[in-house]
Curated annotation (Swiss-Prot):
Chief location: membrane
Protein name from the UniProt record: Protoheme IX farnesyltransferase 1
PROSITE patterns on file: UBIA
Remaining remarks: Carbon 2 of the heme B porphyrin ring is defined according to the Fischer nomenclature.
UniProt source species: Shewanella sp. (strain ANA-3)
Membrane-spanning ranges: 28-48, 54-74, 100-120, 122-142, 149-169, 176-196, 222-242, 243-263, 280-300
Pathway of action: Porphyrin-containing compound metabolism; heme O biosynthesis; heme O from protoheme: step 1/1
Similarity remark: Belongs to the UbiA prenyltransferase family. Protoheme IX farnesyltransferase subfamily.
Amino acid sequence: MAKPLSISSHPSVHLAWRAYFEMTKPKVVALMLLTVLVGMCLAMPTILPVKPLVAGLLGIAMMAGSAAALNHLIDRRIDGMMARTYNRPLPKGRVSATRALLFAALLGCLGFVILYVFTNPLTAWLTFASLIGYALIYTAYLKRATPQNIVIGGLAGAMPPLLGWTAVTNQFHGHALLLVIIIFLWTPPHFWALAIHRRAEYAKVDIPMLPVTHGVEFTKTCILLYTILLAMACLLPVLVGMSGPLYFVCSSLLSTGFIYKAWQLKYQDSEGLAMQVFRFSIYHLMLLFMALLLDHYLWA
């Protein structure tokens, strides 16, 4: 007698969907899309046109998800050896390397077509360059080659505000580059704080993160210096007349908080401070760009 079919006797479609979704790093992409949206809004003195808004966000999100999936694919060996990442879909065998590559290629191609057709070729090619910068230049080479991997590779991750700007204007602007500078300077202290917390794991898999190659104390000093540089960069939108009083106040408070956390990390020997700095940096960037957005509409 034939055995009745049951959901448990086949791979779960729901679990498979979740595995592919996880490979796109949705939380990272969500924060990135906030910076894209802010770039779009600051580029326009009026309400955003619907077509480049929707197509731009969708296309950029898809290509960012593609880059994240390629990151999962390239890092699958070291991910399986680190406590933070061992449960990812590829190390656990929930997705094969071939399917991960096909998924990343499909997602990236669809995103590129959407951007090229419904926004403009400039944004499509800039987003493609960011994908190559993150997935191939940073993940496949820089990450394993130099302790300055985050600094050099951070440029690709700093591009989203510029992508948002070009999506609605089809041109470069100096104001968009200011936003790129802010994220570029934010990236090293954000990742170095995590690298301090996970130093032993990075050393185990031979990834030359700064705390591994130069020591924790040197890295703490670099984090503090970068937060000071970041605080100065965060004032640039005010100095060039791009933003007003609301942003100035919010930026000053956030920068003070970030510097204070970095100072604590440097001069207080307390367990868990590195992860506190890491988490604070996420809120810092999110709230900073929300302040840019609110200021733009309240003081326009």
